[in-house]
Structure formats: C-alpha cells, structure tokens
C-alpha cells in the first residue's frame, strides 16, 4: 500500500527540528517487523514510562508522523516512535524510505539524534566522538553543523577520556558534568569521585580537592586496594565559634571533646577513659 501525504519540509529541517516529509515524498505502509533500529545512534537509554505514554497516544490517535528509514529498513529518524508502536502491538506503520547508503544513513541518524534535548551527557559525548572518529568532523565543523559552541563540544568530547565508572555516574546523575570535568585525565579519578559522593562536595570544593590531591593531603592506603585516604589538614586558625563550641560540648558531656577542622570537612571527637564514660556519652546522646 503506497500513498502520498504532504506533511512538511523534509530532511532540510534536520537540524534542531522534527523531520517531516515534503510534498514529493512518498509515505509507505510496511510491516513493523521489517524495520531495524540503528545500532550507531547515540541514545542508548529509553525511559519505559515515556515510551508507554507514546504507545497509548498511538493507540488512540494512530502514528501521526512517519518514521524515516534507509534502503535497508534501518531507522534514521524515529526510534522512539518505532518502539512505542511495537509496545502498542501495531503491525504496520507509515515510513519514508531515504536513498542513503550505510554511511550517509549513519551520519544523518547521529546528527539528528544528537540534536535531541533529552540525551544524557555521555550519550551526546559519545555521539560527538563517533562523528569525529568515523566522519572526519572537527570541533569547528561539528559546532557549525549542530549550532552548538565549540567549547561545549570540546568539553563533552573530553568526557570520553573518563573511566567507565565515572561515565556511568554521569549518566545516572550521581555526578554532574562540572564534577566530571575536574576529574578528566586524573590518575586517581575514580577514588576522587567516590570521595566527592561520600562527602557530598560541590563543584568548587571538588576543584579545590583536585588541586590539593598531590600536596600530601591525600595518600594511598597501606593495603593493596589502591584506595586513597584523606589526610586531615587542619586550618591554621580555629575561629572563636568553634572554640566556644568545644567548651560548651565538653561542659555538657563532662569529658574532653576536640574538633579537628579540615579544609574539606573535619572531625568531632569524644575522649573517654573507660567504658563507664562511654556509656555516659551514649546515654546523653540518646
């Protein structure tokens, strides 16, 4: 079954907008099982709830916009819609077949998908890397083609140098891009990342942490697990508020209490002489 349908401007509107067919393009209805996803598209994670919402809409209203595929029936644009149709158990869907070879299809699919606003940082970064390595794009050419700043593209490309564990934390929003940029090409990036998470450091604190890492404030553990421990470097001056706090706490608990105030956190220590004093501390804490 073949029919004409005028829905828009075609692939000339590829960058930054939804791709719609022009008057001369032919919309075909084909079996959904013949269509293949594009393994090189940057988006790797599809939220089930959003796909389900789209599937429900398709069940109620039909698929209003055709999927664009190449001669091999590989998706160029529209994988979310294809997945939603599969979920909705739609058997046949409208498509537009573009006369692209494999290389052209791959490039167009990458460019189109990178323009999406809902890609994760690392999905976008990997898409940039693939275009640079396989299609001879430069940072300048990518910036011009995608309408993004050169600094944005250069910064994201550098994220590909991070260890996989940190890339995963970026994708899961455990670390921000600001945190991750501080760790690029650092010998102890993974250990510092764990420290950032465990101590809930902001980006400015992370920058300070990275600057101080090799200045005897941090050291390897004596065991062989390559864990990095934080050495507490005390501030030269303990302000009056902390001194008053130490005195007040010592008086309240009737024991010696000290505070080690470090540049990135600190320690509050209760000193007891025997188990009876420990029991007394615990009872007052309760």
From Swiss-Prot:
Taxonomic path: Bacteria, Pseudomonadati, Pseudomonadota, Alphaproteobacteria, Rickettsiales
Stretches of the chain forming a coiled coil according to its record: none
Keywords linked to the UniProt accession: Chromosome partition, DNA-binding
Name of this chain's protein: Probable chromosome-partitioning protein ParB
Presence of keyword Cytoplasm: no
Cellular component terms (Gene Ontology): chromosome
GO process terms (BP): chromosome segregation; positive regulation of sporulation resulting in formation of a cellular spore
SMART domains: ParB
Gene3D superfamilies: 1.10.10.2830, 3.90.1530.30
Entry keyword DNA-binding: yes
Similarity remark: Belongs to the ParB family.
Protein role: Involved in chromosome partition. Localize to both poles of the predivisional cell following completion of DNA replication. Binds to the DNA origin of replication.
GO MF entries: DNA binding
SUPFAM superfamilies: KorB DNA-binding domain-like, ParB/Sulfiredoxin
